[in-house]
């Protein structure tokens, strides 16, 4: 589970955060302000301070928040002076925006607030549509406005160039005051409540948020233009309401509720991506006629409220179509306030004890949950103040009496010397508020005595009554220690201490077991300074005033650490233990494992000369499955399957799979030797729990053996057994090697193959259809690796994962999977369907099409009917996590309602309607989620689109490895601190660009190439281990009339892939001129490609001929790649179709030397280097 934060404010106005993977409340870094309320999302938090002003807290990150300012310089040609600044009266401004209608001089741009700073000065953009311009950046046209080109022609009468400048948001990890530039007469009065949400309404612009606020006069305000590139927003807009509003709550989508001072609730209707402020209000009455609503909180499709008698209510029937819901249901408990966060999870603050409670059991099927459970986490300051004391206490419990007695005198002496320590003053402003909840049970006898504490006292570490701490001299304290010893005369009841790791030994003394178990007071464990800013007692829990979970993602599959308190230990020391470092633990476990391994070998060697009692053993597993038969008509038929395993005299275990079927009432069978199977993979076929077995021959035919089980568990049992049998037959065990080739199927399944040295041998390389692929647990969209064993992956939701060195996971369990380094992994992706309509002169666009038209609800091709009701998740492992929504990010653009228009089906679609458009479509999306496990750990917090690791490196294990990436926003990043011991690295280094990028690759000698979103190519200069980010970008012209989408760099070769599936090779690359000179076409029908450390080329190809038709998504290997023939000669076809990604960047194993050349060169598999269609 990735880390996210729960925000809370205590009664003193201090802001705390609690991580979903932590156990302690951490005080906000910026503690200069006191707050009343906060509202948080993942990327930021907004709050109202005690001065009633609005502040925002933006998290720091490796990727800066940058905004690009641009203006255009326009010139016209005249016969006297040529191009000059003098324009015609009808022309646009000399300095203008892109349309020419707005006057924009360079000095007219100012920073929007003190929280921004300029990143650089103005400079000219020398790029137009992915093509570099001449020096100076001018583009030419006949007149304003027109189509501009980079080439100057005889009729070019006007020209313009683009100036750009970046500003950077600098106030991160601090509370930044929201300044207003509005008319002073319309400035909002002081604020009383604030709520942020709406991030799921639209993703345009990126990171858009809806910020709603309530003023002291009961007016509602909306903050305009809050997004990722403008975290402060621009202006406040007043929203009219039917009454005076007391409090407001905004959900992640289109749900907005507010409470009136009269006790009713009002609901905002008409909120959508085109109108985020909504249209009108509807009124909802209070669930109780006697007590009105005082607080409300909304989620995606839930509403919770608190009435004035502190009762908790849940609103039934709330959704986007009915935001008002249907009825109220009373919940158990009394709360001051509640807050609904991500996934509709609920938090509340108890009415009596001011403790934060978490609503357990909230699921998509049970939105109201089951029970309230208190969060019992302590504060981070408590852990830091008692770290050494607690480690001593924990350590003392594990040592024998001899060791304890040896240190007894030392501890007593240290206790005497610690008596001179004085503590700071203890605040007395909590005297009227006794401890509540869990704190009350442990300190009920002491809480009320804190009021009499003087301003400067000396606290006795052995006194369980922490409130009684009279000032005393050193002699008085010694006497008090002796008196405490006399009250505990029994040695057996004394918990002795040890002097191991004594960082603050002088602060500790002998403590009785009875005293320790009966008190949770931190002062009973040792002295510590209570700072002047400390508002609570030593072990008192904070008293909370507000909580916000809008940025807290609670994973239902991962338990939280917020509730566990070990018995017998105080809450302040619950997570502290022996001061044994992880390195010591790892060395200890490694030593034990080594000793056990040596003993096993020693015992076996003494008996190897004995004769085997059984020379051969046979084991058979049978079952009933379905088989997709080979002959027409192809359909599923019931078969009996038997897996026979036998062990020969040489100890080798082999297996045969028999499939028995009936053909014309005659019993027949087919058999497969598992040592010939090249891959076993789960496939999607007609909604069955099916999997496929490939052999080299069936790989060539593109026609595997497909079997289906009745249940998912039965399918996984067979997959696990067959995979383990194949690995045993080939003597493959353990994690993949550093030279392994990784690939990902279109389902997101991860496979790995151990390359043979003959794979790149010339002139007779090993055919890649004979490669054996085994599955690795997890779910990813792409994987990248190098020859140092560093492997990174990116999921469909752009989450980044790093390989832990394990193997197995997923359905592969038991002996075929490693016990360590397997972790829970999740992924989210979208399922798309299309709504199609045709125009007719009577009703306009409607769902009534022609008989020859596609289905009115279909997939992208239109050949398969896909409605909202019958569309299922990709497999039973997936579950829906959202409802259907219109996708406005479809390629080609959409109108305000998401429609795309075309002349007919199928055709090229565009986002605006013309007179010739008789059909239209729009895409609907729904998110689904899979939870599995595998040898992967998440690398937070940046989400990525592409990644590249230097394919080979001669550096030491401790030296850093070059790793470059593209974020999902298009930022270029360089990872620092990546080593073989720490493959996850330490931090990101942002590399500035003038536009978003989509692909990047780093070669074996630190050559960094990238592709921008507009299809242009760039080369990064001066990249080296001492200068990992390089110095500048060089614009490389793309192949003529082609837009690039991927680049891959090997040792000396650079290949790119354009959006039409053409593969290109960069010619003329030399150490003195690394940019190269020209592009040379290699092949077509390519989907993805990867260039290895030896310049070997592997691709995912489409339209590969098989025995039953064309296959898409086939792994192919380029043969004949030599220094004198870097483009290679032909394609060798491997596993597929249905593959999405392959990487060969870890395979640095050289082919064996001394091969005898054949008399004639092998005939290429295709002409002109093209994949066969």
From Swiss-Prot:
What Gene3D superfamilies does UniProt report for this protein, alphabetically?
A: Pleckstrin-homology domain (PH domain)/Phosphotyrosine-binding domain (PTB)
Q: Does the keyword Membrane apply?
A: yes
- GO CC annotation: what is one? autophagosome membrane
The record, for PANTHER family, names: DYSFERLIN-RELATED, TECTONIN BETA-PROPELLER REPEAT-CONTAINING PROTEIN 1
Question: What SMART domains does the entry give?
Answer: DysFC, DysFN, TECPR
What CDD domains is this protein classified in?
A: PH1_TECPR1
Q: List the molecular function annotations (GO) for this entry.
A: phosphatidylinositol-3-phosphate binding
TECPR repeat residue intervals: 210-239, 254-285, 301-332, 344-376, 739-766, 962-991, 1007-1037, 1053-1083, 1095-1135
By what name is this protein known?
Answer: Tectonin beta-propeller repeat-containing protein 1
**Locate the PH domain: which residues?**
618-727
Record's compositionally biased regions (Basic and acidic residues): 475-485
Give start-end positions of Polar residues composition bias. Answer: 413-430, 486-495
Taxonomy of origin reads: Eukaryota, Metazoa, Chordata, Craniata, Vertebrata
Q: Where is this region: Disordered?
A: 413-495, 1147-1173
UniProt keyword list: Autophagy, Cytoplasmic vesicle, Lipid-binding, Lysosome, Membrane, Repeat
Source species? Gallus gallus (Chicken)
């Amino acid at each position: 589970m990735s880390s996210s934060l729960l925000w809370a404010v205590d009664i003193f106005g201090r802001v705390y955060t609690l991580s979903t993977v932590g156990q302690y409340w951490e005080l906000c870094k910026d503690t200069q302000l006191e707050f009343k309320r906060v509202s948080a999302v993942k990327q930021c938090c907004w709050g109202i301070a005690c001065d009633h002003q609005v502040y925002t807290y933006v998290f720091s990150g490796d990727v800066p928040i940058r905004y690009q300012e641009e203006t255009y310089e326009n010139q016209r040609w005249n016969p006297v002076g040529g191009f000059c600044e003098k324009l015609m009266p009808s022309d646009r401004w000399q300095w203008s925006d892109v349309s020419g209608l707005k006057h924009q001089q360079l000095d007219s741009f100012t920073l929007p607030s003190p929280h921004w700073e300029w990143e650089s000065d103005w400079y000219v953009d020398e790029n137009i549509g992915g093509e570099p311009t001449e020096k100076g950046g001018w583009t030419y046209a006949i007149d304003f406005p027109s189509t501009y080109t980079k080439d100057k022609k005889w009729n070019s009468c006007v020209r313009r160039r683009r100036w750009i400048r970046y500003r950077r948001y600098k106030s991160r990890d601090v509370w930044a005051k929201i300044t207003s530039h509005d008319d002073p007469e319309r400035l909002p009065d002081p604020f009383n409540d604030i709520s942020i949400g709406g991030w799921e309404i639209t993703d345009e612009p990126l990171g858009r948020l809806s910020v709603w606020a309530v003023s002291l006069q009961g007016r509602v305000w909306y903050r305009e233009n809050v997004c990722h590139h403008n975290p402060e927003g621009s202006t406040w807009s007043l929203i009219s309401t039917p009454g005076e509003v007391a409090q407001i709550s905004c959900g992640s989508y289109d749900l907005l509720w507010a409470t009136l001072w009269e006790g009713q609730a009002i609901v905002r209707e008409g909120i959508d991506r085109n109108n985020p402020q909504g249209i009108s209000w509807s009124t909802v009455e209070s669930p109780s006629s006697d007590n009105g609503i005082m607080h409300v909180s909304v989620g995606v499709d839930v509403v919770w409220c608190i009435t004035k008698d502190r009762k908790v209510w849940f609103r039934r029937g709330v959704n986007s179509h009915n935001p008002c819901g249907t009825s109220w249901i009373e919940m158990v408990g009394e709360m001051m306030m509640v807050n609904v966060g991500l996934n509709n999870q609920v938090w509340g603050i108890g009415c009596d004890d001011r403790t934060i409670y978490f609503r357990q059991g909230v699921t998509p099927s049970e939105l109201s949950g089951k029970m309230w459970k208190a969060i019992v986490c302590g504060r981070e300051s408590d852990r830091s103040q008692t770290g050494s004391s607690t480690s001593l206490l924990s350590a003392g419990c594990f040592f024998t009496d001899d060791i304890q007695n040896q240190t007894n005198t030392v501890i007593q002496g240290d206790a005497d010397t610690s008596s001179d320590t004085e503590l700071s003053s203890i605040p007395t402003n909590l005297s009227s508020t006794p401890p509540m909840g869990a704190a009350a049970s442990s300190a009920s006898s002491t809480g009320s005595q804190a009021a009499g504490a003087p301003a400067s006292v000396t606290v006795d570490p052995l006194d369980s009554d922490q409130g009684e701490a009279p000032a005393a001299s050193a002699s008085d304290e010694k006497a008090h220690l002796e008196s405490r010893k006399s009250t505990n005369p029994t040695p057996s009841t004394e918990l002795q201490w040890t002097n191991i790791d004594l960082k603050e030994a002088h602060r500790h003394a002998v403590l009785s077991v009875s005293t320790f178990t009966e008190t949770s007071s931190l002062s009973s464990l040792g002295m510590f300074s209570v700072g002047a800013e400390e508002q609570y007692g030593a072990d008192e829990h904070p008293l909370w005033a507000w909580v916000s979970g809008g940025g807290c993602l609670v994973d239902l599959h991962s338990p939280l650490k917020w509730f566990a308190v070990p018995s017998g230990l105080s809450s302040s020391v619950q997570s502290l233990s022996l001061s044994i470092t992880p390195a010591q633990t790892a060395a200890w476990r490694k030593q034990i494992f080594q000793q056990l391994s040596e003993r096993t070998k020693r015992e076996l060697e003494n008996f190897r000369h004995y004769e085997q009692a059984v020379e051969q053993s046979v084991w058979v597993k049978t079952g009933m499955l379905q088989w997709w038969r080979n002959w027409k008509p192809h359909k599923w038929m019931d078969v009996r399957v038997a897996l026979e395993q036998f062990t020969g005299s040489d100890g080798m275990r082999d297996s045969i799979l028999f499939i028995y079927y009936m053909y014309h009432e005659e019993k027949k069978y087919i058999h497969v030797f598992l040592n010939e199977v090249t891959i076993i993979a789960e496939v999607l076929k007609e909604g069955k729990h099916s999997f496929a077995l490939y052999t080299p021959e069936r790989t060539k035919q593109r026609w595997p053996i497909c079997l289906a089980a009745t249940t998912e568990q039965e399918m996984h049992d067979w997959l696990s057994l067959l995979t383990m049998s194949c690995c045993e037959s080939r003597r493959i065990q353990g994690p993949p090697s550093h030279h392994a080739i990784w690939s990902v199927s279109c389902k997101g399944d991860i496979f790995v193959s151990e390359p043979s040295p003959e794979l790149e041998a010339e002139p007779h390389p090993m055919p890649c259809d004979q490669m054996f692929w085994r599955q690795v647990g997890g779910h990813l969209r792409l994987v990248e690796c190098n020859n140092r064993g560093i492997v990174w992956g990116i999921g469909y939701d752009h989450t980044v994962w790093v390989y832990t060195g394990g193997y197995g996971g997923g359905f592969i369990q038991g002996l075929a999977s490693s016990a360590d380094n397997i972790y829970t992994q999740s992924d989210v992706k979208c399922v798309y369907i299309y709504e199609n309509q045709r125009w007719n002169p009577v009703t306009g666009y409607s769902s009534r099409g022609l008989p020859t038209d596609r289905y009115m609800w279909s997939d992208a091709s239109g050949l398969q009917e896909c409605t909202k009701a019958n569309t299922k998740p990709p497999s039973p492992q997936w579950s829906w996590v959202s409802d259907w929504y219109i996708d406005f990010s479809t390629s080609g653009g959409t109108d305000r309602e998401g429609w795309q228009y075309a002349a007919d089906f199928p055709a090229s679609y565009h986002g605006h309607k013309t007179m010739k458009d008789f059909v239209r479509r729009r895409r609907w999306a729904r998110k689904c989620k899979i939870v599995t496990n595998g040898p992967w750990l998440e690398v937070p917090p940046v989400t990525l689109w592409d990644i590249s690791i230097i394919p080979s490196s001669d550096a030491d294990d401790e030296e850093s490895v070059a790793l470059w990436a593209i974020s999902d926003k298009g930022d270029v990043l360089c990872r620092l601190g990546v080593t073989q011991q720490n493959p996850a690295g330490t931090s990101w280094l942002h590399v500035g660009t003038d536009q978003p990028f989509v692909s990047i690759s780093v070669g074996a000698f630190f050559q960094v190439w990238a592709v921008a979103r507009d299809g242009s190519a760039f080369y990064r200069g001066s990249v080296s281990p001492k200068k990992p980010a390089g110095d500048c970008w060089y614009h490389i012209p793309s192949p003529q009339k082609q837009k690039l989408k991927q680049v891959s760099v090997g040792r000396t070769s650079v290949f790119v892939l354009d959006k039409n599936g053409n593969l290109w090779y960069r010619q003329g690359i030399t150490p003195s001129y690394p940019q190269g000179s020209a592009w040379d076409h290699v092949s077509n029908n390519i989907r993805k490609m990867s260039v290895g450390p030896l310049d070997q080329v592997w691709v995912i190809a489409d339209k590969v001929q098989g025995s039953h038709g064309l296959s898409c998504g086939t792994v192919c290997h380029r043969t004949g790649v030599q220094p004198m023939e870097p483009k290679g000669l032909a394609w060798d076809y491997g596993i597929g179709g249905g593959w999405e990604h392959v990487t060969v960047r870890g395979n640095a194993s050289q082919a064996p030397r001394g091969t005898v050349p054949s008399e004639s060169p092998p005939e290429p598999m295709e002409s002109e280097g093209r994949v066969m269609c």
